[in-house]
Amino acid sequence: MAHLLLLHGPNLNLLGTREPEIYGRITLPQIDAALAERAATAGHGLSSLQSNAEHVLIERIHATREDGTAFILINPGAFTHTSVALRDALLAVALPFVEIHLSNPHTREPFRHHSYLADKALGVVCGFGVDSYRIALEGVIARLGSDV
């Protein structure tokens, strides 16, 4: 059994009500519950954290050095385009990670086209709405080789 960490960046606590035409109507607790259930079905544990504060996400990433986390799934939200610190934290712990986005940043404003994480991620899943999370998790499960 592997432990997976799912991180959500700024404004994702507003899912379901914030710009539903872009992000959909499903809430973050619904996403977390569905992913935890799928991970458990595959024999893995999954914990999640959402924060609007960059330092909280960084501290949680640092904690993976000692808590047995095997893989990180992260939707960094707007930190994708601004946070060298988040990139450095992910590199410091040297765990594989997948970058996730509900929308496709490349079809949006030009400032959203650059990611500070993508070149270091195992993969990037974007543009599939809530299914972006599911697709990313399935990829991680396949990488771990324990899909049941």
Curated annotation (Swiss-Prot):
Entries under InterPro entries matching the protein: DHquinase_II (IPR001874), DHquinase_II_CS (IPR018509), DHquinase_II_sf (IPR036441)
Site positions (Transition state stabilizer): R18
Recorded name of the encoding gene: aroQ
Reactions the enzyme catalyzes: 3-dehydroquinate = 3-dehydroshikimate + H2O
GO biological processes: amino acid biosynthetic process; aromatic amino acid family biosynthetic process; chorismate biosynthetic process; quinate catabolic process
Oligomeric and partner information: Homododecamer.
Annotated catalytic residues: Y23 (proton acceptor), H101 (proton donor)
PROSITE patterns: DEHYDROQUINASE_II (PS01029)
Organism: Xylella fastidiosa (strain Temecula1 / ATCC 700964)
One Pfam family here: DHquinase_II
GO molecular function terms listed in the Swiss-Prot or TrEMBL record: 3-dehydroquinate dehydratase activity
Keyword Mitochondrion assigned: no
Keywords: Amino-acid biosynthesis, Aromatic amino acid biosynthesis, Lyase
CDD domains: DHQase_II
EC number: 4.2.1.10
Family from the record: Belongs to the type-II 3-dehydroquinase family.
Protein name: 3-dehydroquinate dehydratase
Signal peptide start and end residues: none
